[in-house]
Amino acid sequence: MERKQRKVYQGRVVSDKMDKTITVVVETKRNHPVYGKRINYSKKYKAHDENNSAKTGDIVRIMETRPLSKDKRFRLVEIVEEAVII
């Protein structure tokens, strides 16, 4: 039996205060069904970060996985771009 394709999202880390867990906000754009205006949507996901390598502001890629806790269903795949510290 074949496994379903796992969802992969790219987003920005908004919190890294938890141990081995990051909060990632994923922003998407959709057209309004009647008026056609582009609308921004955002959703927060908790993701597993085994090495605590991602920091707040980083752009990361996360992948769907088995449930790891009450809220965690994603894991960190890679850090696409590190945050610039000013």
Swiss-Prot record:
What InterPro entries does the record tag this protein with?
NA-bd_OB-fold (IPR012340), Ribosomal_uS17 (IPR000266), Ribosomal_uS17_bact/chlr (IPR019984), Ribosomal_uS17_CS (IPR019979)
**Entry keywords, A to Z:** Ribonucleoprotein, Ribosomal protein, RNA-binding, rRNA-binding
GO BP terms: namely: translation
Gene3D superfamilies in UniProt = Nucleic acid-binding proteins
- Give a yes or no for keyword RNA-binding in this entry: yes
- Coiled-coil ranges from the UniProt annotation: none
Q: Which PROSITE patterns match?
A: RIBOSOMAL_S17 (PS00056)
Which molecular-function annotations from GO does this UniProt entry contain? rRNA binding; structural constituent of ribosome
Keyword Ubl conjugation present in the record's keywords: the answer is: no
* Taxonomy, superkingdom: Bacteria
**In this UniProt entry, which cysteines form S-S bonds?**
none
Record's GO cellular component terms:
cytosolic small ribosomal subunit
Q: How does it assemble?
A: Part of the 30S ribosomal subunit.
**What family is this?**
Belongs to the universal ribosomal protein uS17 family.
Query: What's this protein's function?
Result: One of the primary rRNA binding proteins, it binds specifically to the 5'-end of 16S ribosomal RNA.
> What is the name attached to this protein's record?
Small ribosomal subunit protein uS17
**UniProt organism field:** Lactococcus lactis subsp. cremoris (strain SK11)
Q: Which gene encodes it?
A: rpsQ
